């Protein structure tokens, strides 16, 4: 059972929170004043969600937010607005703590909703029966959602600093390991160097001793060459270099592989899971993204997404990253996808293939 959720926003005020229970926003309505623009800030990006005026006092929305997301709402204008929605039923939530909200109606909304519906059916089959939450717990959650905290974005910067420090330590370890690997062959060659001194001392011995030393010296010369070649055998384990030159494929779609994956290949008819970020080629402005949490799933070649994705994702391997440039007729065409995507827009997607099912 879903429970009502609402928030009254005053003009020029910011409301931010780390989400503790998934919820859905169904619409925004003008309260008092002439006009207000509703903004959403998430994942270091800002989005214009809706504009309400005296002429258009109410706008329907379809936004879902998951537990663990860090979001902030704020308005511009002289009017106060009301956000309306509902809390998701606890029994239907996944156990993942860092699922990310994505504005999926911007990427072939109807098809993606159908895809998400099939995903929910799969999750229900796997989850089994769960105990119902007490009414008192739901009431407490509603009270927490009614009071958004103001100016809570500083915590994100701290998290980023900690992540940078951790990644820095990992880079140092990787550097130390690689240096140690490169030094190993040199150490082996150094152990063989006493043969040179043995050669000098051998000159003072008889002819038989010199012949024995010559044979040993020949064997030692062959061994260092074999050992020096050992590091080259490790090179295939490194990430395969990707070509930066764009390739034009079906429908004029251009692809550039930034990272070539090593896992299973994405083929027509397979279901794939991806992270992505979409930008307008005209101004490089981000209109949609999904970079963490539960990846987006769809059937490749099944018409569930834009044509540019059906042909552009094909051939990728798990772990790979690819830039896909979709001309208008392989994206949203002359209609576009207002308000974010205008008519005849060329779209650029950075796609990472996470899994092939």
Curated annotation (Swiss-Prot):
Residue ranges of every copy of the PPIase FKBP-type domain listed in the record? 269-357
Q: Which gene encodes it?
A: Fkbp39
Q: Where is the composition biased (Acidic residues)?
A: 120-182
Q: List the SUPFAM superfamilies hit by this protein, alphabetically.
A: FKBP-like
Q: Which UniProt keywords apply?
A: Isomerase, Nucleus, Phosphoprotein, Rotamase
The Enzyme Commission number assigned here is: 5.2.1.8
Q: Which GO terms describe its biological process?
A: juvenile hormone mediated signaling pathway; negative regulation of autophagy; negative regulation of macroautophagy
What span is annotated as the signal peptide, if there is one?
none
Instruction: Report which reactions are catalysed by this protein.
Output: [protein]-peptidylproline (omega=180) = [protein]-peptidylproline (omega=0)
Where on the chain is Phosphoserine found, per UniProt? 92, 193, 197
Q: What does this protein do?
A: PPIases accelerate the folding of proteins. May function in a signal transduction cascade during early development.
Q: Where is the composition biased (Basic and acidic residues)?
A: 222-237
Instruction: Read off the Pfam families from this record.
Output: FKBP_C, NPL
Which segments carry the region annotation Disordered?
A: 113-251
Protein name, entry field: 39 kDa FK506-binding nuclear protein
Q: What InterPro entries does the annotation carry?
A: NPL (IPR041232), PPIase_dom_sf (IPR046357), PPIase_FKBP_dom (IPR001179), PPIase_Fpr3/Fpr4-like (IPR023566)
Where does the record say this protein resides?
Answer: Nucleus
- GO CC aspect terms: chromatin; heterochromatin; nucleolus; nucleus
Tissue expression as described in the entry:
Ubiquitously expressed, highest levels in ovary.
């Amino acid at each position: 059972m879903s429970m009502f959720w609402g928030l009254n926003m005053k003009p020029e005020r910011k409301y931010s929170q780390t989400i503790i229970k998934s919820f859905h926003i169904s619409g925004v309505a003008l309260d008092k004043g002439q006009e207000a623009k509703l903004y959403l800030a998430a994942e270091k990006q800002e989005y214009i969600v809706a504009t309400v005026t005296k002429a258009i006092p109410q706008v329907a929305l379809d936004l879902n937010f998951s537990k663990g997301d860090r979001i902030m709402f704020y308005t511009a204008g002289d009017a106060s607005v009301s956000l309306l929605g509902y809390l998701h039923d606890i029994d239907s939530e996944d156990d993942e703590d860092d699922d990310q909200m994505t504005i999926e109606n911007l990427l072939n909304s109807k098809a993606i909703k159908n895809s998400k519906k099939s995903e929910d059916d799969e999750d229900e089959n796997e989850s089994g029966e769960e105990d119902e939450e007490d009414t008192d717990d739901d009431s407490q959650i509603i009270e927490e959602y009614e009071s958004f905290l103001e100016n809570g974005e500083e915590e994100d910067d701290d998290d980023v600093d900690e992540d940078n420090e951790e990644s820095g330590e990992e880079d140092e370890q990787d550097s130390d390991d690689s240096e140690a690997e490169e030094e190993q062959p040199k150490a082996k060659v150094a152990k063989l160097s006493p043969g040179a001194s043995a050669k000098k001392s051998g000159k003072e011995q008889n002819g038989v001793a010199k012949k024995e030393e010559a044979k040993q010296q020949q064997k030692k010369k062959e061994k260092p060459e074999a050992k020096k070649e050992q590091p080259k055998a490790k090179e295939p384990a490194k990430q395969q270099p990707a070509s930066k030159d764009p390739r034009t494929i079906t429908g004029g779609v251009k692809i550039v592989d930034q990272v070539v994956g090593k896992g299973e290949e994405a083929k027509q008819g397979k279901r794939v899971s991806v992270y992505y970020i979409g930008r307008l080629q005209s101004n490089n402005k981000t209109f949609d993204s999904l970079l963490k949490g539960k990846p987006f799933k769809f059937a490749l070649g099944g018409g569930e997404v834009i044509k540019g994705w059906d042909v552009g994702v094909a051939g990728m391997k798990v772990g790979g990253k690819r830039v896909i440039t979709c001309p208008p007729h392989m994206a949203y065409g002359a209609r576009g996808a207002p308000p974010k995507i205008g008519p005849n827009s060329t779209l650029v997607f950075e796609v990472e293939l996470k899994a092939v099912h």
